[in-house]
Structures are given as C-alpha cells and as structure tokens.
Amino acid sequence: MPRYKTVEQVLSLMKDRTRVRNIGIIAHVDHGKTTTSDTLLAASGIISPKVAGEALALDYLNVEQQRGITVKAANISLYHEAEGKGYVINLIDTPGHVDFSGRVTRSLRVLDGSIVVVDAVEGIMTQTETVLRQSLEERVRPILFINKVDRLVKELKLSPQEMLNRLLDIIRQVNNLIDMYGEPEFKEKWMINPQAGNVIFGSAKDKWGFSLPMAQKKGINMKNVIDAYTASDKSKLEELAAQAPINEALLDAAIKFVPNPIEAQKYRIPKIWKGDLDNELAKAMLNADPNGPIVFMITDMKVDPHAGLVATGRVFSGTLRSGEELWLVNAKTSQRILQVSLYMGPTRELAEEIPAGNIAAVLGLDRARSGETAISVGFSNVQGSFERLHYISEPVVTIAVEPKNPKDLTKMIDALRKLSIEDPNLVVKINEETGEYLLSGMGFLHLEVSLQLLRENYGIDVVTTPPIVVYRESIRAKSQVFEGKSPNKHNKFYLSVEPLNDKTIELISNGTIREDMDSKEMAKILRDEASWDYDEAKRIIAIDENVNVFVDLTSGVQHLREVMDTVLQGFRLAMKEGPLAHEPIRGVKVILHDAVIHEDPAHRGPAQIYPAVRNSIFAGFLTSRPTLLEPIQKLDIRVPADLIGNVTAVITRKRGKILDVSQIANMSRITAEIPVSESYDMASELRGSTGGRAFWGTEFSRWAPVPDSILLDVVTKIRERKGLPKELPKVEDFLS
C-alpha cells in the first residue's frame, strides 16, 4: 500500500469523529510494547512487514534502539479497515521504564483507550500496575494483550491446560486491578472478558495474535500454537501469522472496545478539565465539536533541528488550521499557528486542518510547555484549564555536568535548556555558590539517557560527578513563635512552624488540595479528611511545589496586605533551601501569627521582608527536631523460589526492608523497599547473587526520615559537598 495514499485516507477520515480512535500501548519495561507498535505499523504500510518487530520504527531515537527501551512517547496515525469501514487509529507508544513514567502520564491524557501489554511469563509487574492505575484514573479504557505466549511453550513447556490456567491467572490479576482502581460507573463494563474479545493472546515478535471470538471464527486453538512452536520448520508459525495476524486482532478490538472521541469526551472532560462545565469551551469539548472554539491540550514538546519547537497534543474541540491565533493559558500569552501536521512515526506529514478528537503536531507555539492548554484567542477570559498532570515519580538523583571542552559551555547550556523543554521531569539548575550546572532526574537510567541525548543530538561530551541523591528537609515537632526582624529593624514577623500530617501531604501530592481552590471547599476537605481546624484551613494562602503550606492567622495588621506577595515570595524562597543542608523543605506548615510593617514602602521592600520571613521560619525549624527525608524506592522482584535467601540478603545489606513475599507459579515475588542512595549498584548485585535469574522493576515509593544513627553523617557530607561550613547553624544565627 503506497504511503501517500494512507496519509490522504487518514486526513479525510479524521473529519468523521465516529471513525477515530485514540489509543496508547502501555506496559512494564521489556514486555514488548514497541514490537507490538511496529507490527501494527507494518500492517498499515508504514514499515516493511519483513522487518517489523526489529525495525523499532517508533523507537526512533538512537538511544532507544541501542538500549531496546522506549524513552519518548512516539505517536502515529494509522488507517485500518474493519467490517468494510475505514478507521483512523491514533497510536501512542509510551515508555515502560519507571524513570520515564512522566512521559506515560502525559500520553495518557490524550488517549481514550489503552492496550495493556503483559508478558505471559513475567505476568503483572510493578510498572504494569502503575500505568494501569494511572490510565484508570484518567478514565482511559483498557484492552489486554498477553504477549510472548511462545515463551510458555518454548521456555516453560506447558501443556494446553496449564497454558490456559496461566493466561486466566493474568486476566484475573488485571480484573482485580480494575476493580481496585476503576471508578464505580466503569468497573463492570471495563472488566476483561475473554468471551467478549477484549483480551488478545499472541506474540508480537512472530506477528500472530487472536481473541477468543476471532479464534472461534477462524477455527484456531492453543494446540495450533503449541504445534507451530514445536514443529521442525517455521512454515506452521508463518501459517499461524497469516491466519491470525496480530494487527487485525488488536485493531479490531480497539475499534470495538475503545470509545470514539464523541463518546469518550462526555465522561473524560469532567474528570480532566478543571473549570466551569457550563461555559462555551467545556460544552464544545463535551461534544468534541469541530466547529466550536479551539481547545488543544499539549502533552509533548520536541525540538526539531530544522523547524524549531513542535507541540504535539490532542484537539479536544475546534479545528486547528495554520494562521489561527491561540491563547496559551499557562504561559499567559498568545501565539499564531505556523503549520499543522500529523505524525507518522518520526516524520511529520503536513495537513491543512486537524479537527476535534484527533492528535496533532503544531509549529509556532514555542512558548508552550508540556501540560499547556491552548485555546482560541477570543476565549482568553474564560476560566479553566486541564487539571495538573500528576507525575508518579519525582526527580531524586542529581549530577553536576560540565563540557569536556570549555568552549562548548554556551552550547551545553542551550542543549540542556532544550532537553528540559522536551522532558519536564528533567530539572536543570545552576548552583549559585559553585557555578555548577546540576541535572536532576527520576533515576540513574533517566540521567544516563539524558547524557547520551546530549552527546548524540547536540554533539556535546560532558564530564559528570558521580550521581548524588536528592534529599528533603523536614521537622518532627511544633515550634514556638519566633520573631524575625528585617535588617533595618522596622518590620517584624511572628511565625511558627509545625509538620503537616501524612493525610494532608497525600491530599496535596495527589492534587485533591490545590492553591487555587475555593478556600471554603479546601477547608471542608482538610477538616473532614485530615483533621484540620476549619477556620485555620480557610486561611491557607499558599502551597508550594514541595508540599509546604503558609497559613495567615493575623487580623487587622496595618500594611500587611500591601506586602503579602513579598512575604509569600520570602516563604517560597526559604522552602527552596532549608537551614540543615540547603536542600528543599517538604511537609511543613508555616503560620504567620502577627506582624509589624513599616508604613513607608521604601522601608519594606524585598531586601527587608525576605530575610525577616526566612529567619523566623529557620529559627522555628531548628527547634522542631529537624531531619532529612530520603527518597525510598519500591522493588518488585521475581526470582526462583530457591534464591529468595540471596535476594533478601542483598536487600537487608542495603538498609532495605521486605514488605511481602508471595508465590506465583514456580516463581517467588518479593516486594521490598530500599533507599535510593543504596540502589546505585543494586542491579549488578542482584544479578550476581542470583546468577542473572532475578528480574525486577522499581518505582519511587515515598520520602522517609533518614535514620537518626546516620543523620548527622549525611548532613555533614552534603554540607561539605556544597562548600558550606561544617558546623550546623544555631537558632541564634537567625535571631538578631
């Protein structure tokens, strides 16, 4: 099928929203997502069927092909016919490695359905559970694809009955997760049911797959599969692939079970749009109206060396055309579209227009970032935007980078800026004291891949420090009220600090409590769910990005309103670098009880207010049993039962603790937690102690206090590394 024909077909079909499906492929690392995508691409004539499965067309970064894992969420529009009708399938391949789960979160926002790929031997792994939970939270309907069924025959040598039991076991586990994380109105309908056909069994590498209804129609059963793999030549396997092509099985299921944008947006918009559902924008989105105002949700920014920044996202309403002016809600500016296109893997194909319900790539919006909402410029005064994306992990590992060749410094700074635009989970900052460029990421692999991208895409070789784990500072007790004076002694602030309880931290972290909420609504939730005093909760006036809260309990203080913005800026700055080790503060409630403000604006500028606010917060902090929090990783390890002892020995040696051990078939599953600081050589140790027979997944679990026995040692090391005085600051240092 010639390629241009497909692009034409895709563009004309995009206008009929009942013929559009937006689906993603999600899974644990190495369970076969990208291979699955390739096989689908081959079927629509985009890559040659001979190399599908090895082409890794969607893994178009060199890094991805070498490591065999997907780093970026790539997307592509496919054409597929089912029951005599043509359909457009917008397909997004998402990374499965936990270090890149930020990209998964962004992709899910634009999908209506997901193909969950599970390895038949390894079963449900941590990352499968995480992405499935995320997709159910975003109201994305799952279809199950049990991949690598050949391993049950070739490696485990199971009989047809044993194979069936194994597959049913995986289906049961997926349904348990849907039951646990799905919303009540969708649970029943979205359950995986082999008879209905929303589970596919197959092997993406060998290009065959079928659902039960398809197998019955074509007269295939598990015995045919076993025969295909036990036969002496490949002809039976090729026959199986011809009789039950995987692309037909998966895409037919997607068309049948994934809702079209008109159906999906009716129930997804109320979940992901925060704003009035009665205004014109929301109404247009609820109906996926191509003639309404434009609402374009941007989930990905890529740097194209020839064209500049390309914004990719979903058109929830309206129709994108070049020349159209859009208002960027977060950037608070308007920009004009220069070009509209759709992605066919790494290449962009130009389009005159892309209507609601589709995925589009746009040039001209270079002020946008991932998570931006772009709307028709005439609606800039209408309140609302998409709910903030919740990333499952936080950057927890940092390295300092400098170019090997000092002449490359400006080039490196520019490249780092571009990388951080493409990947919002990569944080780039300059250490003011040492002038070092610091790169923070979700894990060791995330940073390694970023450095490889620097080398390959921008030609910059860098020298790096060994990875440093990022800590947070916090407190464990309530302080008294301290007075903070401004340097000119004309302004005074009376502040105290106390730790936030776990429930409050959870509500802020998962986005239930937001700074921009109605104060009464916020107070009601905090009172009912986190035991706050209602009146105190109503007076929260700021929440920063590290889950700290500022409460204003003053009444009738003269001139306070005029300087309140400066006070809050002082609070945010103080929270960025705590007194213990200049690490960010987390989980602290700062209460302003009273203040004295000078009447003359000349005497109450930022240079006076910032130190006064900071000093009283820090004095309180140091008297409240301060501590450091370290990032903890959750491990999910599968290992033959006789090697459990070897694995637990490695974990306990690394200050880890075992949470659970269970038996699945002939493997044991160990769930454990271990500090990120101890995980640096974890992979090689696990491999060494199990002779390479353990496979595992990791994900960020939580922040936990560093044990008191090593606290001082850790603080001293961080202070030394940052060039700070060895001795810790005292309360008196902040009280002048």
Curated annotation (Swiss-Prot):
Residues 18-234 form the tr-type G domain. The modification Diphthamide is found at H603. Keywords: Cytoplasm, Elongation factor, GTP-binding, Nucleotide-binding, Protein biosynthesis. Pfam families: EFG_C, EFG_III, EFG_IV, GTP_EFTU, GTP_EFTU_D2. It is found in: Cytoplasm. The keyword Amino-acid biosynthesis does not apply. GTP binds at residues 27-34, 93-97, 147-150. The keyword Aminoacyl-tRNA synthetase does not apply. GO terms for biological process: translational elongation. Gene3D superfamilies: 3.30.230.10, 3.30.70.240, Elongation Factor G (Translational Gtpase), domain 3 (3.30.70.870), P-loop containing nucleotide triphosphate hydrolases (3.40.50.300), Translation factors (2.40.30.10). GO terms for cellular component: cytosol; ribonucleoprotein complex. CDD domains: aeEF2_snRNP_like_IV, EF2, EF2_II, EF2_snRNP_III, Elongation_Factor_C. GO terms for molecular function: GTP binding; GTPase activity; translation elongation factor activity. PANTHER family: ELONGATION FACTOR-LIKE GTPASE 1, TRANSLATION ELONGATION FACTOR-RELATED. HAMAP family: EF_G_EF_2_A. Belongs to the TRAFAC class translation factor GTPase superfamily. Classic translation factor GTPase family. EF-G/EF-2 subfamily. Catalyzes the GTP-dependent ribosomal translocation step during translation elongation. During this step, the ribosome changes from the pre-translocational (PRE) to the post-translocational (POST) state as the newly formed A-site-bound peptidyl-tRNA and P-site-bound deacylated tRNA move to the P and E sites, respectively. Catalyzes the coordinated movement of the two tRNA molecules, the mRNA and conformational changes in the ribosome. This is Elongation factor 2.
